[in-house]
């Protein structure tokens, strides 16, 4: 589906990929400050490239300028896309689908008001919040007691190639600074 050729009520869902709401980020930062939770940030390396197309799905794209565009039979040549790629209208949506399925498989519950927020209460009654963003930086921020952090990071690295960026300092272009028991948010460019 080409983004500019979508039809209302028919194929809008094939390319749309939402992101974490800024109000959710503010709520989670306030919760972390009040409860003394840790906030971590992960960057998924080449996030969209770590996904697969749906079974039976075939996507083709035109050749880049400068390549022979006609085959010997006179028909236009196209490339068949084997995995989602950046710039592909469906890429972010495919990544989102896989990430959500994986997160729910860990036992986290998806929030009703923001698709990018998940929560879980562990066996020892520790509350785990996971907030994700599938923007160009494709990062996830985890807020939980320290012992949950190691387990969650282990599960993440088992499934995805990622970098642990430590304490979250910026998400959705919002600066996040912890000062003792408070967390300050500021708009950063």
Report residues per predicted region.
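Long, low-complexity, charge-biased intrinsically disordered regions
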Residues: 1-189
